Amino acid sequence: MGNLFCCVQVDQSTVAIKETFGKFEDVLEPGCHFLPWCLGSQVAGYLSLRVQQLDVRCETKTKDNVFVNVVASIQYRALANKANDAYYKLSNTRGQIQAYVFDVIRASVPKLLLDDVFEQKNDIAKAVEEELEKAMSAYGYEIVQTLIVDIEPDEHVKRAMNEINAAARMRLAANEKAEAEKILQIKRAEGEAESKYLSGLGIARQRQAIVDGLRDSVLGFAVNVPGTTAKDVMDMVLVTQYFDTMKEIGASSKSSAVFIPHGPGAVRDVASQIRDGLLQGSSANL
């Protein structure tokens, strides 16, 4: 820019306001212009057409009585075809924009709860932009974009919100852990039930094999040794099994056993009890 030999340079993205004897005459676009100062022509000022940004911090209160600082970022620029309005009608453009932002935010936020303010910040930005567009277009300015860039509650409120969020996440984690333990216990119980079922099948087959072996032994012994009865053979088998059991208990150093009468007479008593039980069961079936 300059004024040399009645010539004026206007830079790119800038316009100059030309006056003659203090009266607006024309808007000078970028380039070199002739202004005969001796005829009263002069440049009253320059107006930038670049996009400018204004950050406005507004303190207000929400519907649930929480004080928050809302930071709005306003991007605006002067219109080349309304440069004279932008230059002459407003003396403090930034102050005017700030006043409208305060008005809209303090009218919108008190209607919302704190959580809703965060969720509806785009709606608040849109309301601010619409109000600014209506007001500033009459002064030769265009609102390019309006953003709500930050919402800052009081520090104590932020701490409380973080604690609530942390408690909710801990509760969710506890529920998930309890559910996992429940599933683990169910699976463990199902496994134990299946194991016991298979163990029962094995025991049943083992006992069936023992019964079959005893029956074959009794029959074979009775055939090979004349004069013996089934009772004599059974007593002998029980005594043999008794000594086998005592041998197994004595062979193990860490065995757990329930001590019962262990004399041969006691074995005969046990055999009598078993036979009596079997005979009573057979009589009941008949």
Curated annotation (Swiss-Prot):
Q: What positions belong to coiled-coil segments?
A: 114-190
Q: Where is the lipid attached (N-myristoyl glycine)?
A: G2
Q: Which InterPro entries match?
A: Band7/mec-2_domain (IPR050710), Band_7 (IPR001107), Band_7/SPFH_dom_sf (IPR036013)
**Pfam families attached here?**
Band_7
- Chief place of localization: membrane
Q: Where in the cell is it found?
A: Cell membrane
**Protein name per Swiss-Prot or TrEMBL:** Hypersensitive-induced response protein 1
